Design a protein with these regions (language model features):
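Sec-dependent bacterial lipoprotein signal peptides
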Residues: 1-11
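Cell-wall glycan-active module
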Residues: 13-397
Length: 397
């Protein structure tokens, strides 16, 4: 029952496992003195033409050690997990890529694998009371439920009082779901914790990522729980940040995408062009369609309706417009007929090139956030850290 009380208010919270080594390249077969007369073995594919593993790893470690902030705990462990993620994702260990990851980790967790959330216990209790009143649950019934011993030996009340991290909250929720009466019936398949780990990556993204690309570690637990480990949080966070073809002139826009969703900076610029052509004021949030729980929802968005007003000038009908808008979360959108014709009209109207990138205008909302923050604030703050990191790197000749 307690799981119900926590479910609504803790979603969208924004802020270590042991590394199991994985070779970044295939080792050559051993030399045989008298090989049998067999056909030559088929060469195994290599992910990219990188230097030999030992030199590549040594150079990457040297560079990363120089770029990491001075005073972080378990420097060797962070180095191992960051380089392992790059290798698994086949992303080169360049200063730009390393510093992008470093900047996000520093912003989201200050290099703490399971970062504390200020006031998490207070937030939990406030939501428990709100839900108790909403569902008319007698206070005595709730108090009795919270006195029940949980699997770790403490009562649920004691665990809520001691909450400090999202990983603890996630484990508490799992225990309540399986142990408290009615938990599975009421809340099976739902968990209020939606982000986690040192890069505060979306659990939904991690679950999708593992469907697209094999996870590089031996996994003994759920994808959700892997996000809360250092190795998993770094891997999924770096995938979210770097493992897609962002059409941007600066890393700044990837930082905005990390916060708002992939291609949000590209799409916000597209919305601005639509707004200027149609004369309609639009929220430049990077979402061209309406979404619910991460999937397109019924009903037209404001952006969609504004584009429909331009359909004669675009020489596209509503079905064709919707077809192309459904590509908005992929690189294919910028090659669509809608995208090309819309920008051609916008540039003909203004007499000047229109930007293809823009920081989304989104207010950040979470029980953890106690002041007004935006996606633009996040992106610029991370970009400052990114540039500071680059300044610690080697000077080009």
């Amino acid at each position: 029952m307690l799981a119900c009380l926590l479910a609504a208010g803790l979603g969208g919270c924004a802020t270590d496992g042991q590394y199991e080594p994985r070779s970044p390249a295939v080792s050559p077969p051993p030399v045989r003195a008298t090989p049998p007369p067999t056909a030559p073995p088929t060469a195994l594919p290599r992910p990219s033409p990188v230097p030999p593993a030992s030199a590549y790893e040594r150079d990457g470690r040297t560079l990363l050690n120089r770029l990491l902030p001075a005073n972080i705990g378990d420097r060797a462990g962070w180095t191992t997990d960051i380089l392992a993620a790059l290798t698994a994702l086949q992303i080169p260990a360049l200063p730009e890529n390393l510093c992008a990851a470093i900047a996000v980790i520093e912003q989201e967790s200050s290099f703490v694998a399971d970062p504390p959330v200020a006031g998490l216990s207070r937030i939990a209790w406030q939501e428990i009371e709100r839900r108790r009143e909403k569902y008319s649950i007698p206070k005595l019934v709730l108090d009795l439920a919270l006195r029940k011993a949980s699997p770790d030996g403490r009562t649920y009340r004691a665990r809520i009082d001691a909450l400090q991290t999202e990983r603890q909250m996630n484990a508490l929720y799992d225990d309540m779901l399986s142990e408290l009466p009615g938990g599975k019936t009421l809340f099976g398949g739902y968990n209020p914790i939606r982000t986690g780990g040192p890069m505060q990556v979306s659990i939904a993204f991690a679950e999708e990522q593992i469907r697209q690309r094999p996870y590089p570690y031996v996994r003994r637990d759920s994808v959700r729980n892997e996000v809360f480990t250092r190795r998993g949080g770094v891997y999924f966070g770096m995938a979210m940040l770097l493992d897609y073809p962002g059409p941007y002139s600066q890393m700044l826009y990837r930082f905005a995408d990390f916060n708002a969703g992939r291609y949000s900076s590209r799409n916000a610029a597209f919305q601005d062009a639509v707004s200027r052509l149609s004369g309609r004021t639009l929220a430049l949030d990077g979402d061209l369609l309406r979404y619910q729980d991460g999937v397109p929802a019924d009903g037209s968005s404001e952006t969609q309706r504004a584009i429909f007003l331009l359909r004669a000038r675009l020489r596209l009908n509503e079905a064709e417009i919707l077809r192309d808008l459904k590509l908005e979360k992929s690189p294919a959108f910028e090659h669509s007929v809608l995208y090309q014709r819309l920008y051609a009209l916008a540039e003909a109207s203004s007499g000047a090139p229109r930007p293809r990138e823009r920081l989304p205008q989104i207010d950040l909302k979470s029980p953890k956030i106690t002041r007004q923050l935006t996606t633009e604030w996040f992106a610029r703050r991370v970009d400052e850290r990114y540039r500071t990191c680059l300044a610690r790197g080697p000077v080009e000749a």
